[in-house]
Amino acid sequence: MQQLNPSEISEIIKARIDNLSVTTEAQNEGTVVSVTDGIIRIHGLAEVMYGEMIEFEGGVYGIALNLERDSVGAVILGDYQGVAEGQTCKCTGRILEVPVGPELQGRVVDALGNPIDGKGPIDAKATDAIEKIAPGVIARQSVDQPVQIGLKAVDTMVPIGRGQRELIIGDRQTGKTAIAVDAIINQKGTGIKCIYVAIGQKASSIASVVRKLEEHGAMDHTIVVAATASDPASMQFLAPFAGCTMGEYYRDRGEDCLIIYDDLTKQAWAYRQISLLLRRPPGREAYPGDVFYLHSRLLERAARVNAAHVEKYTNGEVKGQTGSLTALPIIETQAGDVSAFVPTNVISITDGQIFLESDLFNAGIRPAMNAGISVSRVGGSAQTKVIKKLSGGIRTALAQYRELAAFAQFASDLDEATKAQLNHGQRVTELMKQKQYSPQSVAEMAVVVYAANEGFLEDVEVAKMGAFESSLLSYMNSSHAELMAEMNTGAYSDDIAGKLKGALENFKATQTW
């Protein structure tokens, strides 16, 4: 029988102790109690923060949204099929971040910044949190530079400035997305970056928009963030915040960016769905009590920031430049009801609205903008000089025409002044029509509006207004290129007005339309 030597035993124990590596890793863990419709109830996670990312088995992540006394309610990001009751999960100590930077331009990404266009991975150099506090009062600057949309009706009557929030509101199929896409196409060559956030739309509709942007060479300066109708409610809820963070990258570096949320009604629906599944008490129209805060904290991040903010943010790399994030949120109404909960909320948050009507759209007036109730609260100070000077009479002419047209249906004999107003209004209405994907320059708008104001249209047949406009613009661009270039800078003077009048008289004499 072999005998054990006590010294050998002590040596073995010493060696074992020396080789033992004790690493203590404290992790805040919890157990999945239930999984229902993308909502997960977790027992434990005592130290979890609101909005913190939670890691589940299989590399799936969620966000903590409900912190209750004995449980945590979390929403899953992506597919929840692999998560089961009894599994463990742990806090990550991080809040949700998305990639930002110029590497994303020309790409289609999901709400987490992952590419979904099949063009390979995105090598973004930086990431940023999706939930950020909006710039304070001191960091802001007043809106005084224009964003040209390229649509006569919008740029003359409801001008939009850099850093403004202008709501596009209307029923389905009234041309809301068309205005937004035209706005993106018109930013080509201006240096304004664009972000198009598609929320809860059909994948085929998003693909169609991307194809149109590519056709018109607008994808190079655009990021598309897509949360389709088949994506979970959590992705539709987060997509606008992700897009906003990508836009803030440019704003805080002294650049200009335009972001379109298409549309926030579907984000509110997704948030309502999440809130009801989390058992939060429902309020008006079953929306949770904080649905106003959902949109206000998102839209307040669209702003014009001053040079001091940009310099501080970039640690002195960018000096003397202001940055801006301009938002065009879209809201879909049901049967023209703008007094519903979400439309009234967003109207009160934004700096004006473009109201689109089904009746006008069906009558062939496109963009189908109601000039009477569409308004821009801050854009007037950002309008270019030439458009501001010339466009004053357009809104009045249209408003008077709508009023008189309703009255003229019942009146049999009208005086000459009323007839003249009706004729003028008819022609201005025709003039405000514009084909999709054909944005106009400042000079082209100025020529058309000047012709309307100075009575050059009164003897042109209403049916021939479209032909008159296209002939006039091709004549001006070919024969008066210098004058057009001067007006494109926004300049306007008596000298320019005189030249413009002479050019229009010469064109009218040719009768070539």
UniProtKB/Swiss-Prot annotation:
Matches recorded under InterPro entries: ATP_synth_asu-like_sf, ATP_synth_asu_C, ATP_synth_asu_C_sf, ATP_synth_F1_a_nt-bd_dom, ATP_synth_F1_asu, ATPase_F1/V1/A1_a/bsu_N, ATPase_F1/V1/A1_a/bsu_N_sf, ATPase_F1/V1/A1_a/bsu_nucl-bd
EC number: 7.1.2.2
Residues involved in ATP binding: 170-177
Keyword annotations of the record: ATP synthesis, ATP-binding, Cell inner membrane, Cell membrane, CF(1), Hydrogen ion transport, Ion transport, Membrane, Nucleotide-binding, Translocase, Transport
Site (Required for activity): 374
Entry-linked CDD domains: ATP-synt_F1_alpha_C, ATP-synt_F1_alpha_N, F1-ATPase_alpha_CD
Annotated GO MF terms: ADP binding; ATP binding; proton-transporting ATP synthase activity, rotational mechanism
Gene Ontology cellular component terms for the protein in this record: plasma membrane; proton-transporting ATP synthase complex
Location(s), subcellular: Cell inner membrane
Membrane topology: Peripheral membrane protein
Pfam families xrefs: ATP-synt_ab (PF00006), ATP-synt_ab_C (PF00306), ATP-synt_ab_N (PF02874)
Catalysed reactions, as listed in the record: ATP + H2O + 4 H(+)(in) = ADP + phosphate + 5 H(+)(out)
Enzyme class: translocase
NCBIfam families: atpA, PRK13343.1
Assembly with partners or alone: F-type ATPases have 2 components, CF(1) - the catalytic core - and CF(0) - the membrane proton channel. CF(1) has five subunits: alpha(3), beta(3), gamma(1), delta(1), epsilon(1). CF(0) has three main subunits: a(1), b(2) and c(9-12). The alpha and beta chains form an alternating ring which encloses part of the gamma chain. CF(1) is attached to CF(0) by a central stalk formed by the gamma and epsilon chains, while a peripheral stalk is formed by the delta and b chains.
Family per record: Belongs to the ATPase alpha/beta chains family.
Role this protein plays: Produces ATP from ADP in the presence of a proton gradient across the membrane. The alpha chain is a regulatory subunit.
UniProt protein name: ATP synthase subunit alpha
Organism: Teredinibacter turnerae (strain ATCC 39867 / T7901)
